């Protein structure tokens, strides 16, 4: 037993030793304050316990002193709770003393869970309470386990002084699970925990209400996926940490957000981590939640404008937390949903860019630091902006319906964005001129986008604009100039109809209707005979109809019946039809009876005292024969005789007895009534009988007689006589000059005068008679020889005249005015009427601007002859004016210079200084003159307003020049120098000039001719601000439009600079065509109310004078039908020195005026083209001509004749094989010389540079390449930067027209490589694209060229059958230029010979450009310009007509 008892005791001890906790490392070391090993009473360590429910509490156990019998209790000294018999959830607390630590430390402890049934006795929680605050939730816990011994745990608490904390152990019982929970060996170590992570300091977080607060927990230690992290609130609420990020192997971080913070969210938070080795706890950080501020009062309104509001924010009194770091103004329309905010950085704030007449709601926003720091908007200020001026006037105003008496306008609808006010008015203002009086009217428009003006006059040019106005201002639309449609015209004024009757003609003239209601196109005159004085007259055929063109308000009716009253009904027509007719009656004069023919035989019978003749009845003409008379005339040989063609009939009846008393050579032998001579019957002269009071005495056998028979008609106070010599008796001398039976001249007026009494002749003897006979024969021979010589000379002169005038044509006035004109020729009618060659019932052939038949007009004197005469004008005397009709002949004769020509006439002009120029010579003004000898005369100089402090600032080298009936119409000045640019603009403003004409380039032949005095954008010259608005480049001139404003003035003026760029450096232009178009453009665009036109070249003399002289003479030719160039230049030079400076310029002025008169103004506005096209293309059935045909004939006349010296290069032998025809050679001055080198090949190609309407040298016109010129062709394309090639002919090997481009590959043509890129076919067009480069100069790169082959033009036709397809070529060309070469590349155009087809295409392109740029169509001018450089451009009338037709088609496509 003893041995067994001892053995049992030993086993018990061993068991107790197993339950005892193992010794801790360093367990014997001294623990810091707060630690406790429980070897002594726990109170000695500062620990305390709190009594739990029903006495459930911690107990200190020391099994060494008091062994425990329950084997589940460990051995040693420790704190323990017994959960046996306890209800679930009972808690017992062990409180450690309060700790204040300054550095990193660690609390570790051991815990023990045991039970008899191996079930968990409950839970152990550890709390860390900071600064005496709430206990919160546990930071560490263990439950549901039974330990196999003591287990160590660590607490890494990061709460430091001055804060303090307390650790609380809490045990929680679990019902039905008896057992023990023990804690022992609590230590506070002065080093980091080995396993539990330590937190770095957690920072306070400040947020604004509603924002998410984010805490970042940073811990030192290793992170494990099994670790648990959370954010613990002061009151115990836990929030899981959302994001964990490993910083490095010894540090990691985690973040957690507190969402949607509010004032209730204000608290303290700390980070807690639970790992396998224990827990880490951070310090508490505060979550501070601020209330964003908001103002108490609304903003204060200080000022109101149309687009702004001045406010005072009133942000001093707020609700919420400061500080305020930002003030903002929030505004919105009261009806809108959008809002904008502006930052306010001053006590007052101006809201900009507001909409006018809009109600706004304005609030103030205040912002404090932090996200979400902007408070709610403060109370609103509600106010409305003022109205503003409209943004612009009505736009895209157009006329959508034009009628004779009304117009319908349409414009782009606009709303508030344009009116800038909700209350506005829209008004249409219009004005027109009627009967030389200007009318203005306006109407208020109620509709939104269209309106019809009613009650207008037909064909009235109306200037109208729309006016948009509101309470603050008004804006106008662009002015529209529109013409109402034509209507039928009113009646021709009856009182204006005047008639000039003749025997078989009636000249009638009238005035246009007072209300033309359009362009009078035709007058219709219906005429018919309504009665005759001659009962036998057959009037059935005396009727007809005549049409007259608008500029012919007169007509000569021929082929009428004498003595007949005609009814004339005249009515005028416009394109709309004929107006009401008006009728008048005019009677022709009676005509002398028509005498029958008599044979030159001897009389029926003759005795010594009688002679028997045969009398035949006369045929009445307009009035019955009143009486027949037999007249016997004695032929006295000693008296001189008049020529037969001026012998008159015998109007004064003289009886035989009175003849003796009056010494009359004739007497009336008989007077017979018509009833006495119903048929032919014989009559014996000298039968000694009396007939109706006249004695027929016997004839004297010693005298010679002529027997005359005359018939007389009387009616309405007119007496007309016709007579015939029937026979002679006694063979009177000189009778051979007149054959018996020949009718004599007619007496055109009634005569009742008495002859003066003459003393009777005495008889002479036969010797004297014989002498008279001999003298008469001699005289007859002399006269006959003189007549023959005269006739021969006239025939020679006529032949020479016809040769000389072969190229002449009739010249009418420059514009369509009814001025008297006449054909050039030697035949002139000495009567008061010049008769037209037209048919009675036909149209007079005419064209716009000129008459191809002379206009009929009443004259009291004959036209002066135009036969060539020797002109000899003395020097220094005025020369006579030249009629427009005579100008061609005059210039031709003056150029011949036979005795007196242009050289002598020019030298007769005053040269050099002719007046004082003292002001210009002053020292202060010398540097203002470009040339010392071209300066301003004192009497005509422009005086500028004197600037303050500079008495010489009134001088500028400029003179006033008078125009045609317009004083000071021009200012001639020098090209501005750098020193005078400001003075130049002062002059422009002072004189209110709207046009500057510049006839020089800035630099010519390397010398500065004029400085650039205009800006590219905006420039200020002194106190004048000049702004460039638009630049319109054309082939021969450029039009720049500026606005000009002077400082201190509100007025803004528009100014145009017309810059003629084509005047050559030397001499004068080859042709005046371009300059004439330039002059017309200046005249058209210069406002009538503007000040003088400022004209300058370099010196302001030569070219300046040419422009002014041409413009002035064109006005004179238009208004007077004459030109007076000599005296015009003479007057110009009296106002400025040496205007028109050289003889060459003087001749050029003549040539320009001649071309203007020959060609006229053929431009047609686009708006009138459709209506006028019918008239100008209509074929007159009488003349088989049209105005287009007349234009083309004129074009052929004025086309320059090519001389061999003009195309000398093409005529060189080495170039012969490069020309298809030696008849079609390019002019030397138009040649594009090849630049690329190709071996020994010359630089010549049969091509010519041609201008388009708006680009100089835009076209290169050439022939289809020959086999030996293909390389030259591609050199041309490359050298002249040609981006397009247009081919207008078919390929034909018979004519050596082969393909000259590669197909689907590349090829080399001389130095040029041509590479095929693509091709497509579009109806009649094959479109190819090539890439070309010069292989000899690869550094120049390659170029893209399009090739347009037009296959819709058959070889046998002058024109293509389709206008639309050719227009498609033009449009493709335009599109390519816009997209690929920026309109800088040229276009090669070729047909077979580079003539008709090429010219037609170039003309069509230019017409399209003209329509786009200037809204006019002038086919004549375009073709004339092309022919100036190549005479075979547009070769046939059909091609010329085709250009017109394509223009019409082009307009129809819009």
UniProtKB/Swiss-Prot annotation:
Organ and tissue specificity: Expression is restricted to the CNS. Distributed throughout the brain and spinal cord.
One GO-annotated biological process of the protein: negative regulation of receptor signaling pathway via STAT
InterPro entries, sorted: ConA-like_dom_sf (IPR013320), FN3_dom (IPR003961), FN3_sf (IPR036116), Ig-like_dom (IPR007110), Ig-like_dom_sf (IPR036179), Ig-like_fold (IPR013783), MAM_dom (IPR000998), Prot-tyrosine_phosphatase-like (IPR029021)
Keywords tagged on the record: Disulfide bond, Glycoprotein, Hydrolase, Immunoglobulin domain, Membrane, Phosphoprotein, Protein phosphatase, Receptor, Repeat, Signal, Transmembrane, Transmembrane helix
Topological domain ranges for the Extracellular compartment: 30-770
Active site: 1097 (phosphocysteine intermediate), 1391 (phosphocysteine intermediate)
Record keyword Lipid biosynthesis present: no
Residues that bear Phosphoserine: 1221
Residues annotated as domain Fibronectin type-III: 295-388, 393-487, 488-594, 670-767
Record-annotated disulphide pairs: 217-271
Chain intervals with Polar residues compositional bias: 824-841
Location of region: Disordered: 800-852
One MF annotation (Gene Ontology) recorded for this entry: beta-catenin binding
GO CC terms: cell surface; plasma membrane
Residues annotated as domain Tyrosine-protein phosphatase: 902-1156, 1188-1450
Short name of one Pfam family: Y_phosphatase
UniProt-annotated binding residues for substrate: 1065, 1097-1103, 1141
Subcellular location(s) of the protein: Membrane
Glycan-modified residues: 82, 102, 141, 212, 425, 514, 551, 605, 658, 688
Topological type in the membrane: Single-pass type I membrane protein
EC number, as in UniProt: 3.1.3.48
Annotated function: May be involved in both signal transduction and cellular adhesion in the CNS. May have specific signaling roles in the tyrosine phosphorylation/dephosphorylation pathway in the anterior compartment of the adult cerebellar cortex.
PANTHER family the record matches: PROTEIN-TYROSINE-PHOSPHATASE, SUSHI DOMAIN-CONTAINING PROTEIN 1
UniProt-recorded name of the protein: Receptor-type tyrosine-protein phosphatase T
């Amino acid at each position: 037993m003893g041995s067994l008892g001892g053995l049992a005791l030993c086993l018990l001890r061993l068991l107790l030793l197993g339950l005892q906790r193992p010794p801790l490392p360093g367990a014997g070391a001294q623990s810091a304050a707060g630690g406790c090993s429980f070897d002594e009473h726990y109170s000695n360590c500062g620990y305390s316990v709190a009594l739990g429910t029903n006495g459930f509490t911690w107990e200190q156990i020391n099994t060494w002193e008091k062994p425990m019998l329950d084997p589940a209790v460990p051995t040693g000294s420790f704190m323990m709770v017994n959960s046996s018999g306890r209800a679930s959830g009972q808690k017992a607390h062990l409180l450690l003393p309060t700790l204040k630590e300054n550095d990193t430390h660690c609390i570790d402890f051991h815990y023990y869970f045991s039970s008899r049934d191996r079930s968990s006795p409950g839970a152990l929680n550890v709390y860390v309470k900071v600064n005496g605050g709430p206990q919160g939730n546990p930071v560490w816990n263990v439950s549901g386990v039974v330990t196999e011994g003591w287990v160590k745990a660590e607490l890494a608490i990061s709460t430091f002084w001055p804060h303090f904390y307390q650790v609380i152990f809490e045990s929680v019982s679990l019902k039905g699970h008896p057992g023990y929970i023990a804690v022992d060996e609590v230590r506070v170590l002065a080093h980091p925990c080995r396993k539990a992570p330590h937190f770095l300091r957690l920072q306070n977080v400040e947020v604004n209400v509603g924002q998410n607060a984010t805490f970042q927990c940073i811990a030192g230690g290793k992170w494990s996926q099994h670790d648990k992290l959370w954010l613990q609130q002061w009151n115990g609420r836990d929030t899981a940490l959302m994001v964990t990020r490993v910083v490095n192997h010894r540090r990691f971080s985690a973040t957690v957000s507190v969402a949607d913070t509010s004032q209730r969210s204000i608290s303290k938070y700390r980070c807690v981590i639970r790992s396998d080795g224990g827990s880490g706890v951070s310090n508490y950080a505060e979550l501070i939640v601020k209330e964003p501020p908001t103002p108490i009062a609304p903003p204060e309104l200080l000022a109101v404008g149309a687009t702004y509001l001045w406010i005072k924010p009133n942000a001093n009194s707020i609700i919420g937390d400061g500080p305020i770091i930002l003030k903002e103004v929030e505004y919105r329309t009261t009806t809108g949903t959008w809002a904008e905010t502006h930052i306010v950085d001053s006590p007052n704030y101006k809201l900009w860019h507001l909409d006018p007449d809009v109600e706004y709601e304005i609030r103030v926003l205040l912002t404090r630091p932090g996200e979400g720091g902007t408070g709610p908007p403060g109370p609103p200020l509600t106010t409305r902006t003022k109205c503003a001026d409209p943004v612009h006037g009505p736009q895209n105003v157009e006329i959508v319906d034009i009628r004779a008496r009304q117009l319908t306008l349409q414009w782009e609808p606009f709303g508030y964005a344009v009116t800038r006010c909700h209350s506005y008015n829209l008004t249409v203002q219009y004005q027109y001129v009627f009967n030389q009086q200007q009318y203005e009217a306006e109407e208020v428009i109620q509709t939104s986008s269209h309106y019809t003006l009613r009650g207008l006059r037909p064909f009235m040019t109306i200037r109208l604009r729309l006016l948009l106005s509101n309470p603050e201002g008004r804006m106008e639309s662009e002015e529209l100039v529109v013409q109402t449609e034509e209507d039928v015209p009113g009646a021709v004024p009856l009182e204006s109809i005047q008639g000039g009757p003749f025997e078989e003609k009636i000249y009638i003239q009238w005035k246009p209707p007072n209300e033309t209601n359009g362009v009078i196109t035709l007058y219709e005159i219906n005429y018919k005979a309504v009665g005759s004085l001659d009962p036998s007259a057959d009037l059935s055929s005396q009727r007809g109809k005549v049409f007259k063109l608008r500029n012919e308000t007169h007509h000569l009716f021929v082929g009428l019946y004498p003595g007949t009253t005609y009814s004339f009904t005249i009515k005028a027509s416009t394109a709309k039809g004929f107006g009401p007719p008006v009728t008048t009656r005019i009677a022709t004069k009676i005509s002398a009876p028509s005498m029958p023919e008599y044979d030159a035989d001897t009389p029926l019978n003759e005795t010594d005292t009688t002679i028997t003749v045969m009398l035949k009845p006369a045929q009445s003409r307009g009035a019955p024969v009143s009486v027949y008379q037999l007249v016997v005339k004695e032929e006295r040989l000693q008296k001189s005789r008049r020529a037969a063609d001026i012998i008159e009939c015998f109007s004064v009846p003289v009886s035989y007895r009175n003849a003796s008393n009056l010494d009359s050579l004739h007497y009336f032998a008989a007077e017979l009534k018509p009833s006495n001579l119903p048929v032919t019957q014989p009559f014996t002269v000298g039968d000694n009988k009396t007939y109706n009071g006249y004695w027929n005495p016997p004839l004297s056998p010693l005298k010679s007689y002529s027997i005359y028979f005359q018939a007389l008609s009387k009616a309405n106070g007119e007496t007309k006589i016709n007579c015939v010599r029937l026979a002679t008796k006694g063979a009177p001398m000189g009778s051979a000059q007149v054959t018996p039976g020949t009718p004599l001249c007619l007496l055109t007026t009634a005569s009742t005068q008495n002859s003066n009494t003459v003393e009777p002749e005495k008889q002479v003897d036969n010797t004297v008679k014989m002498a008279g006979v001999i003298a008469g024969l001699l005289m007859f021979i002399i006269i006959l020889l003189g007549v023959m010589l005269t006739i021969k000379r006239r025939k020679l002169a006529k032949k020479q005249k016809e040769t000389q005038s072969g190229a002449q044509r009739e010249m009418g006035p420059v514009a369509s005015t009814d001025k008297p004109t006449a054909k050039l020729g030697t035949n002139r009618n000495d009567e008061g009427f010049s008769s037209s060659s037209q048919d009675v019932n036909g149209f007079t052939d005419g064209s716009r601007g000129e008459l191809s038949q002379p206009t009929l007009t009443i004259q009291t004197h004959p036209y002066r002859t135009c036969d060539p005469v020797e002109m000899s004008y003395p020097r220094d005397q005025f020369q006579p004016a030249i009629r427009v009709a005579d100008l061609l002949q005059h210039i031709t004769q003056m150029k011949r210079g036979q005795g007196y020509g242009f050289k002598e006439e020019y030298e007769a002009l005053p040269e050099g200084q002719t007046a004082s120029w003292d002001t210009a010579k002053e020292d202060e003004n010398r540097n203002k003159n470009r040339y010392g000898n071209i300066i301003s005369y004192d009497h005509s100089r422009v005086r500028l307003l004197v600037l303050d402090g500079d008495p010489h600032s009134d001088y500028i080298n400029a003179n006033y020049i008078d125009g045609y009936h317009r004083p000071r119409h021009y200012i001639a000045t020098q090209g501005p120098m750098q020193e005078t640019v400001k003075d130049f603009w002062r002059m422009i403003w002072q004189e209110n000039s709207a046009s500057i004409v510049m006839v020089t380039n800035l630099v010519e032949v390397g010398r500065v001719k004029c400085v650039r005095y205009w800006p590219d954008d905006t420039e200020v010259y002194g106190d004048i601000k000049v702004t460039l608005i638009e630049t319109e480049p054309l082939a021969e001139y450029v039009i720049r439009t500026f606005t000009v404003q002077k400082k201190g003035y509100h007025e803004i003026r528009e100014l145009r600079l017309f810059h003629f760029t084509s005047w050559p450096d030397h001499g004068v232009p080859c042709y005046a065509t371009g300059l004439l178009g330039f002059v017309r453009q200046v005249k058209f665009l210069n406002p009538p109310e503007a000040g003088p036109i400022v004209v300058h070249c370099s010196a302001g003399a030569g070219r300046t004078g040419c422009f002014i002289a041409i413009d002035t003479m064109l006005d004179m030719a238009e208004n007077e039908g004459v030109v007076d160039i000599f005296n015009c230049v003479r007057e110009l030079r009296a106002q400025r020195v040496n205007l028109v400076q050289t003889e060459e310029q003087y001749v050029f002025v003549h040539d320009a005026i001649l071309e203007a008169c020959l060609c006229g103004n053929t431009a047609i506005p686009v708006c009138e083209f459709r209506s006028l096209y019918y008239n100008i293309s209509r074929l007159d059935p009488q003349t088989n001509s049209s105005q287009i045909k007349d234009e083309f004939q004129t074009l052929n006349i004025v086309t320059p004749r090519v001389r061999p010296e003009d195309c000398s290069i093409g005529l060189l032998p080495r170039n012969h094989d490069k020309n298809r025809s030696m008849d079609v050679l390019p002019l030397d001055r138009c040649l594009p010389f090849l630049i690329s080198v190709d071996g020994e090949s010359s630089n010549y190609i049969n091509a010519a540079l041609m201008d388009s309407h708006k680009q100089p040298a835009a076209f290169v016109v050439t022939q289809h390449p020959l086999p030996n010129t293909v390389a030259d062709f591609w050199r041309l394309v490359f050298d002249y930067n040609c981006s397009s090639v247009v081919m207008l002919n078919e390929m034909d090997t018979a004519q050596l027209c082969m393909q000259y481009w590669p197909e689907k590959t590349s090829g080399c043509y001389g130095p040029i490589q041509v590479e095929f890129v693509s091709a497509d076919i579009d109806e009649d067009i094959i479109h190819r694209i090539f890439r070309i480069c010069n292989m000899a100069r690869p550094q120049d790169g390659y170029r893209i060229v399009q090739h347009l082959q037009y296959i819709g033009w058959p070889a046998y036709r002058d024109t293509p059958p389709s206008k639309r397809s050719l227009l498609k070529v033009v449009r493709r060309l335009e599109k390519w230029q816009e997209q690929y070469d920026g309109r800088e590349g040229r276009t090669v155009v070729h047909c077979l010979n580079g003539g008709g087809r090429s010219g037609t295409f170039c003309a069509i392109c230019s017409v399209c450009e003209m329509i786009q740029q200037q809204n006019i169509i002038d086919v004549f001018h375009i073709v004339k310009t092309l022919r100036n450089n190549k005479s075979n451009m547009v070769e046939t009338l059909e091609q010329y007509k085709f250009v017109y037709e394509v223009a019409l088609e082009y307009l129809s496509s819009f």
